[in-house]
Design a protein with these regions (language model features):
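Short, proline-enriched alpha-helix->beta-strand connector loops that line the catalytic pocket
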Residues: 108, 201-208
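Short, solvent-exposed loop/turn and secondary-structure capping segments
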Residues: 67-69, 84-90, 124-128, 172-173, ...
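Gly/Ser-rich "nucleophile elbow"/oxyanion-hole loop immediately N-terminal to the catalytic nucleophile
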Residues: 64-65, 69, 124-164
Length: 304
């Protein structure tokens, strides 16, 4: 068995804690519940040229929920290079488990939509074509098209999730279409919207679940995140989850290394698991029902 490389923070973990090197859940178990399609749109710069954006989706009415009811749509923005792994992108974006019965029942049913960036690697191996501001309108238009043609206009609320680069895109989407979305769940980004934009969030009763680890390898908490926390705390509807350590389901502190350590950046993994350890213990005591509990509360409040 290959010996795992110790992460650079290994000597800082609490006494009695241990490190594990992969999530405890299986990937792909629910991929068959998702469909894949393609959205065609025109670019601003090349009005005569059509572009395509692939996407995955899940329809709750195919899995026991009544067809004549309205449901929210949960949009999941994947991270950098995740479009290059095929169907695994469903999992990496944090969407797969939202097709599970327990998640769907917790929120009363929800459509799931995963837009896919047209990423590729250049001759030097660098990822190009990932999410940026040029994708904001196409993603918005995809959501509108999906709501009309896939959900028959029966969409109640719109919630956008994002992981890493997708979390930055998550903020940018709501910044641009603040009166369109009802909630956002950015995971693993320091690109928090400015104060004036957060004021617009409050004016539109936007709910925000902000999640970033204090030891995120790509987003320095002390210099980039901590200065923005007081402003987030003043928002009308903001839950802040900034754990000291990111854990796997077995209570092990998470380490992931694909040439660079990123275990503490990959908060998407426990968020995908509803912030629950495998033994049913909540990772965040103030969220006894996990992320789906927060989503359920948000949806009920928005319906009131």
């Amino acid at each position: 068995m290959t010996e795992k490389q110790l992460p650079p923070w290994a000597n800082e973990i609490p006494e009695g804690a241990f490190i594990t090197y992969e999530p405890t859940y299986k990937t792909g178990e629910y991929f068959s519940r998702f469909h894949k399609d393609c959205f065609v749109y025109k670019t601003k710069k090349l009005l005569k040229r059509q572009e395509k954006m692939n996407y995955y989706f899940y329809d709750p009415t195919e899995h026991g929920f009544p067809k004549d009811c309205e449901y929210p749509v949960f949009v999941f923005m994947h991270g950098l290079s995740n479009s290059l792994v095929g169907d695994l992108c469903i999992n990496y974006a944090g969407a797969e488990f939202y097709s599970k019965e327990e998640y769907q029942n917790a929120v009363g049913g929800a459509y799931l939509l995963i837009p896919i960036a047209n990423e590729y690697r250049d001759k030097d191996g660098k990822v190009k074509g990932s999410w940026d501001e040029s994708h904001i309108k196409p993603v918005h238009d995809l959501i509108c098209d999906f709501a009309k043609n896939r959900a028959g206009g029966r969409i109640s609320k719109k919630v956008i999730f994002g992981n890493s680069r997708g979390a930055t895109m998550c903020f940018k989407m709501v910044d641009a279409y603040t009166d369109f979305f009802d909630a956002l769940v950015p995971i693993g980004t320091a690109d928090i919207s400015d104060d004036a934009t957060l004021d617009r969030y409050d004016a539109n009763d936007i709910w925000l679940f902000y999640a970033t680890g204090k030891r995120d390898e790509f987003n320095d908490y002390k210099t980039l995140v901590a200065p923005r926390i007081p402003r987030l705390k003043r928002m009308k509807h903001c839950f802040i989850f900034t754990p000291e350590w990111v854990y796997n389901g077995d209570h092990g502190i998470a380490s992931i290394n694909f040439g660079v350590e990123m275990g503490q950046h990959c908060l998407i993994n426990p968020m995908h698991c509803n912030l629950m350890f495998d033994d049913g213990t909540p990772m965040e005591p103030t969220l006894p029902d996990g992320v789906t509990g927060w989503l359920s509360q948000m949806l009920k409040s928005c319906m009131a």
